[in-house]
């Protein structure tokens, strides 16, 4: 008589926010669908970024702000993988961990959400001095460059909290990731999808990044069913660009990528916080050279003065 030994439960780490859980439960359901004989459990954790809500993100620093507790869980063998919004995952991961999978990207654009009194308007037609809420230096710098007539104010909290602040007239409009609103079934709140000519999106925006222990072949084989090669190549180029610029999540660096067959085009941008200087350029390469493409574009922007802008920002934040 043979005794069957069931495979161990796979434990998935997640932040506790509504958006994080929607994303993590989607991953759990997809894995369960492909591997019905396996058990997948979700373990929720609170990250530093979830706890500190009264300080602007740029002032806290960003080394693992939304990821460290999840990473500690994997390194301590309490969890086997962690689901992140890829834009929150630092480009340099702790020793022993790796980016195991990039899921199919949804809309990576930024979205304008208006207070009811401004319905029908867009960024260009909002009145002089209108208060726009954003916690992202990338959005702030680009929008200041294009719309100097607007006023910008920090906004923190989860998506529902930010929308509540908008609806209670603390802001005339706020900027959020379209992907988050779509995943929360709130796409009806989007008043304008901001085109890349105005605001290049964050590195990895719109994709989920699933982190796991390096060399964990069992978990990596499970994650293959979630991998989207087009999204991965685009995001690898974007992350290499950010890494080469030595920028984190809280610096004004934006990107846009486009795949045409095997040809990958990357546009990258670095801007000063006051919106006075904006350096932008584009390069293309075969998709198999995605990481080199990102590095090359970063070096090209450095030659045009991007390094000086970033050094000023880091010095100002007290982290230079």
From Swiss-Prot:
One of its GO terms (cellular component) is cytoplasm. It comes from the Bacteria. The keyword Transcription regulation does not apply. Its EC number is 2.5.1.61. Keywords: Chlorophyll biosynthesis, Porphyrin biosynthesis, Transferase. Its cofactor is dipyrromethane. The modification S-(dipyrrolylmethanemethyl)cysteine is found at residue 249. GO terms for molecular function: hydroxymethylbilane synthase activity. PROSITE patterns: PORPHOBILINOGEN_DEAM. It catalyses: 4 porphobilinogen + H2O = hydroxymethylbilane + 4 NH4(+). It is an enzyme of class 2 (transferase). InterPro entries: HemC, Porphobilin_deaminase_cofac_BS, Porphobilin_deaminase_N, Porphobilinogen_deaminase_C, Porphobilinogen_deaminase_C_sf. Pfam families: Porphobil_deam, Porphobil_deamC. Pathway: Porphyrin-containing compound metabolism; protoporphyrin-IX biosynthesis; coproporphyrinogen-III from 5-aminolevulinate: step 2/4; Porphyrin-containing compound metabolism; chlorophyll biosynthesis. Binds 1 dipyrromethane group covalently. GO terms for biological process: chlorophyll biosynthetic process; heme biosynthetic process; protoporphyrinogen IX biosynthetic process. HAMAP family: Porphobil_deam. The porphobilinogen subunits are added to the dipyrromethane group. Belongs to the HMBS family. NCBIfam families: hemC. Tetrapolymerization of the monopyrrole PBG into the hydroxymethylbilane pre-uroporphyrinogen in several discrete steps. Monomer. This is Porphobilinogen deaminase. It comes from Synechocystis sp. (strain ATCC 27184 / PCC 6803 / Kazusa). The gene is hemC.
């Amino acid at each position: 008589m043979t005794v069957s030994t069931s495979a161990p439960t796979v434990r998935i780490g997640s932040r506790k926010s509504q958006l994080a859980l929607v994303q993590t439960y989607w991953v759990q359901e997809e894995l369960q669908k492909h591997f019905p004989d396996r058990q997948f459990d979700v373990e929720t954790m609170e990250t530093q970024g979830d706890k500190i809500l009264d300080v602007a993100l740029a002032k806290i620093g960003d080394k693992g702000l939304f990821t460290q507790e999840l990473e500690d869980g994997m390194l301590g063998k309490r969890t086997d993988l962690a689901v992140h919004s890829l834009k929150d995952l630092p480009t340099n991961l702790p020793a022993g961990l790796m980016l195991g999978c990039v899921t199919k990207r949804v809309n990576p654009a930024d979205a304008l959400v208006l207070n009811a009194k401004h319905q029908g308007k867009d960024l260009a037609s909002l009145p002089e001095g209108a208060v726009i809420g954003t916690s992202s230096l990338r959005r702030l710098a680009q929008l200041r460059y294009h719309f100097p007539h607007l006023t910008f104010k920090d906004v923190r909290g989860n998506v529902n909290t930010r929308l509540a602040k908008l609806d209670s007239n603390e802001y005339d409009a706020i900027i959020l990731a379209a992907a988050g609103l779509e995943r929360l079934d709130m796409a009806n709140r989007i008043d304008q999808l901001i085109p890349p000519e105005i605001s290049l999106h964050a590195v990895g925006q719109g994709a989920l990044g699933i982190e796991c222990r390096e060399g964990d072949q069992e978990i990596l084989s499970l994650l293959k069913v979630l991998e989207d090669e087009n999204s991965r190549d685009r995001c690898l180029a974007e992350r290499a660009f950010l890494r080469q610029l030595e920028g984190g999540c809280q610096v004004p660096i934006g990107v846009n990528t486009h795949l045409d067959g095997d040809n990958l085009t990357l546009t990258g941008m670095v801007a000063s916080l006051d919106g006075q200087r904006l350096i932008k350029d584009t390069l293309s390469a075969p998709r198999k050279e995605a990481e080199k493409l990102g590095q090359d574009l970063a070096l090209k922007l450095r030659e045009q003065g991007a390094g000086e802008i970033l050094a000023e920002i880091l010095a100002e934040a007290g982290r230079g």
